[in-house]
Amino acid sequence: MSDSARIVAIDHVQLAMPEGGENAARAFYAGVLGLTEMPKPAELAGRGGAWFAAGRVQVHLGVEADFRPARKAHPALQVEGLAALVARCEAAGVTVARDVPLPGMDRVHIADPFGNRIELVERVSTRSGRDAG
């Protein structure tokens, strides 16, 4: 390519939710995962749903009339303190599926209240003592 256009980051991830699920979304994304709800722009507020953020990570939940949860496609949220977050999820009744660790990474899968799959990953030191990130 000869122009200077390039993708530099993911701005947000959008997941679908059923109509009327905003309170369940708040309880899970803010209450369990610890994200902060952010106000939706006035132009989009009437559509329902809710937006959440932690640092530069944004997760948007949008209402979908013919809702079906994403069970394969999923965001992977990088965390610090995976064991503590897993304990918080389990205490809240969220099923945690541990997955095969990858080199330099521990990971688990959970589902939001609507059945959308979410992967939680934490970078861990490799055997050589260097950070895997």
Where are these regions (language model features)?
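N-terminal beta-strand motif that seeds the catalytic metal site of vicinal oxygen chelate
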Residues: 1-26, 73-75, 128-133
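Core segments of cupin and vicinal oxygen chelate
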Residues: 15-57
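A short linear hydrophobic-aromatic micro-motif
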Residues: 37-39, 61, 95-98
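A short beta-turn/loop motif at secondary-structure boundaries
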Residues: 42-45, 66-69, 100-103
